[in-house]
From Swiss-Prot:
GO terms for biological process: defense response to Gram-negative bacterium; detection of lipopolysaccharide; inflammatory response; innate immune response; macrophage activation; MyD88-dependent toll-like receptor signaling pathway; positive regulation of interleukin-1 beta production; positive regulation of NLRP3 inflammasome complex assembly. The keyword Transferase does not apply. Residues 24-629 are extracellular. Keywords: Cell membrane, Cell projection, Disulfide bond, Endosome, Glycoprotein, Immunity, Inflammatory response, Innate immunity, Leucine-rich repeat, Membrane, NAD, Receptor, Repeat, Signal, Transmembrane, Transmembrane helix, Ubl conjugation. Transmembrane receptor that functions as a pattern recognition receptor recognizing pathogen- and damage-associated molecular patterns (PAMPs and DAMPs) to induce innate immune responses via downstream signaling pathways. At the plasma membrane, cooperates with LY96 to mediate the innate immune response to bacterial lipopolysaccharide (LPS). Also involved in LPS-independent inflammatory responses triggered by free fatty acids, such as palmitate, and Ni(2+). Mechanistically, acts via MYD88, TIRAP and TRAF6, leading to NF-kappa-B activation, cytokine secretion and the inflammatory response. The TIR domain mediates interaction with NOX4. Residues 651-828 are cytoplasmic. It is found in: Cell membrane; Early endosome; Cell projection, Ruffle. This is Toll-like receptor 4. Residues 670-813 form the TIR domain. The lineage of its organism: Eukaryota, Metazoa, Chordata, Craniata, Vertebrata. One of its GO terms (molecular function) is transmembrane signaling receptor activity.
Length: 828
C-alpha cells in the first residue's frame, strides 16, 4: 500500500532533475546554477567554471590538500559548502573570505595540520561548523571566537583532552549545540566551565558521549543551566558512573540523556544505585537508553525523578514494576523496546502523553487510570484487547490520539463511549473482530484520522462508518467487502479529503458510492480487481485531484463513461493494468493518448493483449482496424473517384499549390526578400559570399535558404513552395554546371517560372556563377532561352567585378522596396 505522503510525492510535480548545459562534462547538477555535487572528481583545486550564483557546493572526496586565501572568491552566494575528506592539511588566512552568506561548513575527515588564525575570517553568517576527525587537539587554539552567529559546533572524533571551554565562548552567544563526543576527555574541573558562569548559554546542548570519563569535580556544574546533556557510553564502570553523576550536582538541565548505544557496551553490570546522584539535579526531561541489563526493580530510580515532566526508557530490561503511582508528576511517559514481566500498572494523575511501543512481555492489556491522558501510543506490542474501547479501558475522557496499530487480536465490544474527544485513531495491521456487527464509531464525531488498513475487516454492514461526520482521512487498504462490491458506506463522510481503498479485492462499486464525498481530493483504488474503468461514480467528486487505479486488471473503459471524470482531476494513475490493444477498444486507447498530460507515468502503460502486442507501450501503438463490408464498398468507390481526380490533377499539382499559395499570401507581407535556388555544390559560395554580403551588408536583406529556413519534418517540395516561393518577394537563381545537372535545382527553377507567372510582383534574378558550356546549357531549353533574352548577373572574382556585381544585385533586390538611412530593408 502506498502511504499518503508517498502517493502525494509521486503525483505532485516536484522539481525536474536537470543536467548542466555547460561545455564541461563533469558537473552533475541537482539544481542548475544553485546546487552542484562534485564528489570524487579528482579535483586538485577549486573549480572556477561554476556560476557565481552557486549556493550549495559539495566538493567532498577530492584531493584539494591546500586552501589558500580567497579560495572561494568566485562563489559569493554560497550557503552550504561540503569539503569532507579532501585531504586538506593547510588552511590559510582568509581561505573563506567573501563567503558572507555561508551558513554551513563541513570539514569532516581532513588531516588538518596548519590552521591559520584567520582561517575562518569573513564567515559572518556561519551557523553550523562540522570539524569531525580533523586532528583537533584543543578548543583553545581553534580560531572561531569571532563567529558570533554560530549555532552548532561539531568537533566529535578528535583528540581533545581538556573540557575547558575557552574565553571566546562568551562571544558565541547563539551557540545551541556543542558535540564533543568520541574525544579523549577524562576529567571535568570547575575551572573548565567558568565561561558558562560568566556568560550563560541557556539553550546549549552538550554531547559528551563516548569519552572515557573517570572524574567530574563536585561543583563543576553547580548553577550551570543547559538545554540538553548527553552522556552515553561515557563510563567504564558502575562506580565511575555513580561518582561522575554525583559530580553533576547543582546542574539545571532541561533534557538529560544517560545510557549506552546499541552496539557499544562499556558497563559489565548496572543497577539503579548508580543514579542516586540524580536527586541533586534539576531535570525537566530524562531518558535512559540501551541499558540491556536485567533490573529487578527501578522504583528507586523513579523516586529521584518523580518531578520530571518527561520520563523515557529505551531498550531497558525490567524484571518487575510494582506500579507507576499517583506520586509521580510526569506529563509524558515513554517506554520503547523494553522488556517487562507483565503489562505495568499505570495510575498517573498528571500524565498527558503515554508512548508504550515495541515492548516485549505482558501481551495482555490491563486497564489503566490516566485521567489527564490526551495522547496514547500502544503500537507494535502484540497486545490483545477484549471489549475495546471505552473510557473505562484508559481511565480518561480527554483522549485525542490513540494508536493501537501492529498489535494482536482486538475485539470491538464498545463504540468508544466516553472517548468522544478522539481525533486520531490507528488500528492498522492489528486483527479487528466484530467490526461489521454494529456502528463501532458512532460516538466519534470529532475524529479526523482513521486507519483500519490490513485489519482483516470484512465489510458487510453499510453503517460501519456512521457517526464520523468530521473525518478527513480514511485508510482501509488490505481489507475485503461482501461479494467484492463497494456499497454506499460513506454517506456521512462529507468532510473526507483522503480515501485509501487499495488491496481490497474490489471488482465492482455502487454508482452512488462516492456521491457524498464532495470534498474528496485523493482516492486510491490501486491493487484491486477492476476489469474496466467505470468513471460514472466519480462525477460528483468536484474536488478530486488524485485518482490511483494502478495494478488492477483494466482492459478498457465503458464507452459512454470517459466524460465523467471531474474537471478538478490533475493526476490519474493507470499504470500496470491489462490493456487490450485491439480495434474493439480503439477509442479508449486513443483517449489515453489524448490525456497524456493527465496520466501519471503514461510511458509505463503497456499492452497485455493480444500476445503479439504484449509489452508494447500504449503511446507507441498504431492499430490498423478492419472495417465492415459496407464501409469497404464505400471506401473502394471513394478510392476510385479520388484516383481519377488524382490522375487529372497530378500534372498540375504544384501549379495548384502555387495558385493556392498566391491566393492565401498574395495580399500579405513577405517574410524574405529573396529565395535562393542553388546547387549544394555551390553552398560555400552562397554561405561565404551571398549571405555574408546581403544579410550583413548595408542595406540588409533577409534570404530564404533551405539549410536554415526549411521546416524539419516537412516534404522538400512543400518547403520549397510554402517557405520558399510564397514567403519571398523575389527568387535568386545561382546558375552553374552543378545547377544544370541537378534534378532538384531544375525542379525549383521550373516552379519559379510558374510562380513568376502567377504572382504579378514576383521577379527572378539570374546569377551565372561560372561559365557554362553551351552544349550543356542547351539541354535545358527554357533556361537557355531565358538567359539569351534576359539580363543576368555574372560573378567575377576581382575587386572591380565584385563591386559592380554587388551594386547591381542590391539594386535589383531594392526594386519596389523602401529603404531607410539606417540600412534596413522592409520585407514588404
Amino acid at each position: 500500500m502506498m502511504s499518503a505522503s508517498r502517493l502525494a510525492g509521486t503525483l505532485i510535480p516536484a522539481m525536474a532533475f536537470l543536467s548542466c548545459v555547460r561545455p564541461e562534462s563533469w558537473e552533475p547538477c541537482v539544481v542548475p546554477n544553485i546546487t552542484y555535487q562534485c564528489m570524487e572528481l579528482n579535483f586538485y583545486k577549486i573549480p572556477d567554471n561554476l556560476p557565481f550564483s552557486t549556493k550549495n557546493l559539495d566538493l567532498s572526496f577530492n584531493p584539494l590538500r591546500h586552501l589558500g586565501s580567497y579560495s572561494f572568491f568566485s562563489f559569493p552566494e554560497l550557503q552550504v559548502l561540503d569539503l569532507s575528506r579532501c585531504e586538506i592539511q593547510t588552511i590559510e588566512d582568509g581561505a573563506y573570505q567573501s563567503l558572507s552568506h555561508l551558513s554551513t561548513l563541513i570539514l569532516t575527515g581532513n588531516p588538518i595540520q596548519n590552521l591559520a588564525l584567520g582561517a575562518f575570517s569573513g564567515l559572518s553568517s556561519l551557523q553550523k561548523l562540522v570539524a569531525v576527525e580533523t586532528n583537533l587537539a584543543s578548543l583553545e587554539n581553534f580560531p572561531i571566537g569571532h563567529l558570533k552567529t554560530l549555532k552548532e559546533l561539531n568537533v566529535a572524533h578528535n583528540l581533545i583532552q581538556s573540557f575547558k571551554l575557552p574565553e571566546y565562548f562568551s562571544n558565541l552567544t547563539n551557540l545551541e549545540h556543542l558535540d564533543l563526543s568520541s574525544n579523549k576527555i577524562q576529567s571535568i574541573y570547575c575551572k573548565d566551565l567558568q565561561v558558562l558562569h560568566q556568560m550563560p548559554l541557556l539553550n546549549l546542548s552538550l554531547d559528551l558521549s563516548l569519552n572515557a570519563m573517570n572524574f567530574i569535580q563536585p561543583g563543576a556544574f553547580k548553577e550551570i543551566r543547559l538545554h540538553k546533556l548527553t552522556l552515553r557510553n561515557s563510563f567504564d564502570s558502575l562506580n565511575v558512573m555513580k561518582t561522575c553523576i554525583q559530580g553533576l550536582a547543582g546542574l539545571e538541565v532541561h533534557h538529560l540523556v544517560l545510557g549506552e548505544f546499541r552496539n557499544e557496551k562499556n558497563l559489565e553490570k548496572f543497577d539503579t544505585s548508580a543514579l542516586e546522584g540524580l536527586c541533586n539535579l534539576t531535570i525537566e526531561e530524562f531518558r535512559l537508553a540501551y541499558l540491556d541489563y536485567y533490573l529487578d526493580d527501578i522504583i528507586d530510580l523513579f523516586n529521584c525523578l518523580a518531578n520530571v515532566s518527561s520520563f523515557s526508557l529505551v531498550s531497558v530490561t525490567i524484571k518487575s514494576v510494582k506500579d507507576f503511582s499517583y506520586n509521580f508528576g510526569w506529563q509524558h511517559l515513554e517506554l520503547v523496546n523494553c522488556k517487562f514481566g507483565q503489562f505495568p500498572t499505570l495510575e498517573l494523575k498528571s500524565l498527558k502523553r503515554l508512548t508504550f511501543t515495541a515492548n516485549k512481555g505482558g501481551n495482555a492489556f490491563s486497564e489503566v487510570d490516566l485521567p489527564s491522558l490526551e495522547f496514547l501510543d500502544l503500537s507494535r506490542n502484540g497486545l490483545s484487547f477484549k471489549g475495546c474501547c471505552s473510557q473505562s479501558d484508559f481511565g480518561t475522557t480527554s483522549l485525542k490520539y490513540l494508536d493501537l496499530s501492529f498489535n494482536d487480536v482486538i475485539t470491538m465490544g464498545s463504540n468508544f463511549l466516553g472517548l468522544e474527544q478522539l481525533e486520531h485513531l490507528d488500528f492498522q495491521h492489528s486483527n479487528l473482530k466484530q467490526m461489521s456487527e454494529f456502528s463501532v464509531f458512532l460516538s466519534l464525531r470529532n475524529l479526523i484520522y482513521l486507519d483500519i488498513s490490513h485489519t482483516h475487516t470484512r465489510v458487510a454492514f453499510n453503517g460501519i462508518f456512521n457517526g464520523l461526520s468530521s473525518l478527513k482521512v480514511l485508510k482501509m487498504a488490505g481489507n475485503s467487502f461482501q461479494e467484492n462490491f463497494l456499497p454506499d458506506i460513506f454517506t456521512e463522510l462529507r468532510n473526507l479529503t483522503f480515501l485509501d481503498l487499495s488491496q481490497c479485492q474490489l471488482e465492482q462499486l455502487s454508482p452512488t458510492a462516492f456521491n457524498s464525498l464532495s470534498s474528496l481530493q485523493v482516492l486510491n483504488m490501486s491493487h484491486n480487481n477492476f476489469f474496466s474503468l467505470d468513471t460514472f461514480p466519480y462525477k460528483c467528486l468536484n474536488s478530486l485531484q488524485v485518482l490511483d487505479y494502478s495494478l488492477n486488471h483494466i482492459m478498457t473503459s465503458k464507452k459512454q463513461e470517459l466524460q465523467h471524470f471531474p474537471s478538478s482531476l490533475a493526476f490519474l494513475n493507470l499504470t500496470q493494468n491489462d490493456f487490450a490493444c485491439t480495434c474493439e477498444h480503439q477509442s479508449f486507447l486513443q483517449w489515453i493518448k489524448d490525456q497524456r498530460q493527465l496520466l501519471v507515468e503514461v510511458e509505463r502503460m503497456e499492452c497485455a493483449t493480444p500476445s503479439d502486442k504484449q509489452g508494447m507501450p500504449v503511446l507507441s501503438l498504431n492499430i490498423t482496424c478492419q472495417m465492415n463490408k459496407t464501409v469497404i464498398g464505400v471506401s473502394v468507390f471513394s478510392v476510385l473517384v479520388v484516383s481519377v481526380v488524382a490522375v487529372l490533377v497530378y500534372k498540375f499539382y504544384f501549379h495548384l499549390m502555387l495558385l493556392a499559395g498566391c491566393i492565401k499570401y498574395g495580399r500579405g507581407e513577405n517574410t524574405y526578400d529573396a529565395f535562393v535556388i542553388y546547387s549544394s555544390q555551390d553552398e560555400d559560395w552562397v554561405r561565404n559570399e551571398l549571405v555574408k554580403n546581403l544579410e550583413e551588408g548595408v542595406p540588409t536583406f533577409q534570404l530564404c535558404l533551405h539549410y536554415r529556413d526549411f521546416i524539419p519534418g516537412v516534404a522538400i517540395a512543400a518547403n520549397i513552395i510554402h517557405e520558399g516561393f510564397h514567403k519571398s518577394r523575389k527568387v535568386i537563381v545561382v546558375v552553374s554546371q552543378h545547377f544544370i545537372q541537378s534534378r532538384w535545382c531544375i525542379f525549383e527553377y521550373e516552379i519559379a517560372q510558374t510562380w513568376q507567372f502567377l504572382s504579378s510582383r514576383a521577379g527572378i534574378i539570374f546569377i551565372v556563377l561560372q561559365k557554362v558550356e553551351k552544349t550543356l546549357l542547351r539541354q535545358q531549353v527554357e533556361l537557355y532561352r531565358l538567359l539569351s533574352r534576359n539580363t543576368y548577373l555574372e560573378w567575377e572574382d576581382s575587386v572591380l567585378g565584385r563591386h559592380i556585381f554587388w551594386r547591381r544585385l542590391r539594386k535589383a533586390l531594392l526594386d519596389g522596396k523602401s529603404w531607410n538611412p539606417e540600412g534596413t530593408v522592409g520585407t514588404g
